[in-house]
């Protein structure tokens, strides 16, 4: 296994400290690829954005389009939770109770090339940080909008939710919207 970089290491205690669900669902393991730590009977509806699609011919980022697609993707992934048929009642109860979704990305390297940036250079690193901050903030604001429309997920407790390691790192705008 060491010759192919597998198995990877995952520090589940760190995941639990960062997890927004720390107060109602202790994470126990990850899915096979490792991108999603989950609790017992946990599932997560996953989706991905192709970042290369958000650069125009002038090497500019289509920020408004990106924000729109992020918000649409969050709504779509949330709707999938209700459309799913779950084979085990524990999974059904769990997923509908916490409404966990995961919106990831692909195409970062291609996006950087289209922008004329070299992966790993300082400018690319700074841009990538701003990009992922935008992704996270827009996704959380879209989730807040859904909560206003449909109601918060059943296990939501704003005070506890905002105590997670991840939410402590979010902007004041997002934290205020969640509260």
Model region roles, listed by residue range:
Residues 101-104, 137:
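Short acidic alpha-helix initiation/capping motifs at coil-to-helix transition points
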Residues 69-92, 96, 118-179:
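Internal maturation/activation junctions in enzymes
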Residues 3-95, 100, 107-115:
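Function-dense linear segments that define catalytic or interfacial modules
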């Amino acid at each position: 296994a060491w010759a192919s970089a597998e198995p990877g290491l995952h520090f589940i205690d760190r995941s639990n400290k960062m997890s927004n669900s720390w107060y109602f669902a202790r994470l126990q393991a990850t899915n096979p690829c490792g991108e999603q730590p989950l609790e017992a009977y946990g599932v997560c509806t996953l989706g991905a954005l192709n970042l290369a699609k958000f650069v125009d011919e002038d090497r500019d980022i289509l920020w408004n389009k990106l924000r729109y697609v992020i918000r649409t993707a969050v709504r779509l992934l949330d709707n999938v939770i209700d459309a799913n048929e779950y084979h085990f009642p524990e999974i059904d109860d769990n997923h509908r109770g916490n409404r966990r979704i995961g919106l990831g990305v692909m195409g970062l390297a291609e996006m950087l090339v289209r922008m004329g940036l070299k992966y790993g250079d300082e400018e690319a690193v700074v841009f990538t940080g701003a990009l992922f901050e935008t992704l996270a903030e827009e996704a959380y604001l879209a989730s807040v909008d859904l909560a206003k429309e449909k109601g918060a997920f059943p296990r939501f407790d704003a005070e506890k939710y905002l105590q997670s390691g991840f939410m402590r790192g979010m902007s004041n705008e997002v934290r205020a919207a969640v509260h």
